[in-house]
């Protein structure tokens, strides 16, 4: 019993230690486009200004706002920094040749989560490649959770990949894409995203904490059977899944578009309200409806990963299916770990009088902090 209690308390201690930052992860967007003829490819690399500020410093006057003038003044240094961390090789008839990255210009663009530097360059290969090998090393020394989202466009085919610290290189055909590899990449990305999306995890825990108990006569009482608890879990998790799948699909297809700050603030608010409902139970019997309503907001947060890739057609379908499947796998893993432990402790005073309210207080405090920093300019 003490071991189980320590494990459960450790979950919240870890959450407190690692969840001070806002939800949106560090991503860059790299696009390589092969024309119908010739050996060269066009490259475009969108890198968040906040990441470049962290890496080399852009805010010359220290006012917290990076202007186009400040970015332009450091343009050559930004270009050198980025391109030195990207290697492209062309493969044709079994021969592998290094391709030269020739910078062209730099622009500014606004993504859903803020400003980005847009580096445009040419990938000059000795001969027209049938395959490309890409090695990506941007920001991993500063943020091992950084992701590079690679979109490759060739005549008749598009494909997308996710590059990470543990998977910095990828090799692919330009003419005949490996769709299964793309699907696997986005399944992995979905799993990573839910396990690193601490606000999503804590909202899920606010749904799972009461699953093994009932609020009757002014207090929490243990459910009588595991079947009853599992049915409650099935209802709330299914509702949450359906809801965030709907808004994820709508947002990635451009049918819903809300400012990132509004979405991230809304997610923090859902976590706070979920925690408060565990402390002061108002919604008791229809928690699945709450899970559905709040899940719509969480889906918009998931969409931030894919929305800026500009995918379409089969490429978009694979990314959506894979990413959503990965999110569900991650959620299922959390449920499978948490519910057996919670069910085993449900009859103890520790769970009903200490862990549930204590966990709700910790989650609520974190959510209130997130809400404050996300609403603030």
Label each PLM-derived region with a short phrase.
Residues 17-21, 373:
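Membrane-interface motif at the C-terminal end of an N-terminal transmembrane signal
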Residues 20-195:
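N-terminal soluble domains immediately following signal/targeting peptides that reside
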Residues 5-15:
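Bacterial N-terminal signal peptides
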């Amino acid at each position: 019993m003490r071991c189980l209690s320590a494990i459960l308390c450790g979950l919240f201690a870890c959450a407190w230690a690692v969840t001070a930052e806002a939800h949106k992860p560090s991503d860059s967007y790299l696009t390589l486009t092969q024309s119908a003829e010739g050996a060269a490819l066009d490259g475009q690399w969108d890198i968040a200004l906040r990441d470049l500020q962290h890496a080399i410093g852009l805010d010359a006057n220290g006012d917290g706002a990076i202007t186009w003038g400040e970015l332009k003044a450091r343009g050559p240094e930004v270009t050198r920094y980025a391109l030195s961390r990207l290697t492209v090789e062309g493969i044709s008839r079994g021969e592998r040749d290094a391709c030269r990255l020739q910078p062209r210009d730099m622009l500014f663009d606004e993504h859903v989560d803020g400003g980005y530097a847009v580096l445009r360059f040419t990938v000059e290969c000795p001969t027209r490649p049938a395959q490309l090998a890409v090695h990506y090393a941007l920001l991993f020394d500063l943020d091992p959770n950084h992701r590079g989202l690679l979109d490759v466009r060739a005549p008749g085919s598009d494909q997308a990949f996710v590059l990470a610290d543990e998977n910095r290189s990828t090799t692919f055909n330009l003419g005949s894409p490996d769709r299964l590899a793309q699907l696997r990449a986005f399944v992995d990305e979905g799993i990573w995203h839910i396990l690193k999306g601490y606000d999503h995890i804590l909202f899920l825990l606010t749904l799972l904490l009461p699953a093994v108990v009932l609020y009757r006569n002014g207090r929490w009482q243990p459910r009588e059977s595991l079947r009853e608890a599992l049915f409650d879990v099935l209802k709330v998790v299914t509702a949450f899944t359906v809801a965030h799948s709907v808004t994820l699909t709508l947002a990635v297809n451009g049918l819903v578009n809300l400012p990132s700050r509004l979405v991230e603030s809304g997610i923090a608010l859902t976590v706070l309200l979920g925690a408060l409902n565990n402390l002061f139970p108002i919604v008791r019997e229809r928690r699945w409806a709450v899970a559905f309503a709040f899940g719509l907001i969480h889906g918009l947060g998931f969409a931030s990963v894919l929305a800026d890739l500009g995918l379409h057609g089969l490429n978009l379908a694979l990314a959506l299916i894979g990413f959503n499947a990965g999110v569900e796998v991650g959620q299922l893993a959390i449920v499978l770990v948490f519910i057996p432990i919670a069910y085993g402790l449900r009859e103890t005073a520790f769970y009903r009088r200490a862990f549930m309210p204590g966990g709700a207080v910790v989650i609520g405090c974190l959510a209130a902090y997130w809400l404050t920093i996300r609403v603030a300019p």
